[in-house]
Amino acid sequence: DQRQQLLQRSALGRRLIEASQRSPLEFVEQEFEHDAVRAGLLFFNGLREVDLRMHGFGHSIPALLAGSNMAQMCRGGAVALAEALTADIREHGGEIRTSAEPQSILMQNGRAVGIELTDGERLTSEGFIASGLNPQQTFLKLLSADAVPQTVREQAAGFRYNLLAPLFGLNVALDEPPQYSAAEKHPELNDAFMVILGLERLDQFHEIVTAHEHGRIPPTVMWGACPTVFDPSQAPAGKHTGFMWEKLPYAVNGDPKNWDALREEHGRSMLRLWADYAPNLNEVVLDSFTRSALDTERSLPNMQFGDLL
């Protein structure tokens, strides 16, 4: 295509084409030597929900290094961002419905003209109808079979979610922020915007993938932050909040419902590991709660298998 032709004209362009043909894992193993650097690059790339074994995505590693985008946090918390977006929609004449479950997409003369809710209400539009739901919900559940080409239905049925996408979350209310032991020599660590714990070597990536493939819980590698260090408005005066996330399989031990019995103990395990690095957490945790990939799917059904995308 035109892009390929343009890239072929320069050495850097040809280099990009060559890198793109590899998987992120191959790129890191072939271009970097230090085990910790390899592990870190793969971990950060994995946070972007790219399957690190997938050929055709090798360029995602140099794109990660060259990109100007940094981790960000919304002042007031994620709810403040949601409230700002909804306020803007309403200001421009839009309407938002919550707890309204769609039953079908209404079709007329070969085009979508509205949706019908499970309570029987119909909402129509003279403009266009857009779906932000997953492929199975949109093309197999909400649209009738005669409204979707068979090839599209087959593609939707065959869509596979990212093996490493599901997240497990530990959230804590604190009397004070974590104080890391390593900060005695490197005080800036207590002001880190993001902390990664448990990541030591490249082989851990393979162990995590294998654990996900077999529905097992791998040795913990987690990342998180203490948002109130940067935005005190997210907690009562003098108090703090913190969180850690870990990529864990949806169907743990073969069945996602197993998370109901395992969730709290795994959260305690994460907190113990966190306290190994920040010992004051043994004394300052006021309360905590956990959230598994199954919990995500239960509250947000469009995130099938807990896939956040």
Feature-to-residue mapping (PLM):
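Rossmann-like flavin
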Residues: 1-54
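Helical element adjacent to the flavin cofactor pocket in flavoenzyme catalytic cores
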Residues: 29, 61-121, 126-127
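A glycine-rich dinucleotide-binding beta-alpha-beta segment and adjacent secondary-structure elements
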Residues: 34-49, 217-225, 279-309
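Surface-exposed helix-capping loop/turn segments at secondary-structure junctions
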Residues: 35, 90-96, 108, 180, ...
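Mid-domain catalytic core of redox enzymes
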Residues: 73, 103-235
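Short glycine/threonine-rich loop-to-helix capping motif typified by GTGT followed
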Residues: 107-112, 144, 257-259, 291-306
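Conserved FAD/dinucleotide-binding core of flavoprotein oxidoreductases
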Residues: 136-141, 173-175, 196, 208, ...
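Flavin-binding catalytic cores
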Residues: 177-178, 205, 209-219, 260-295
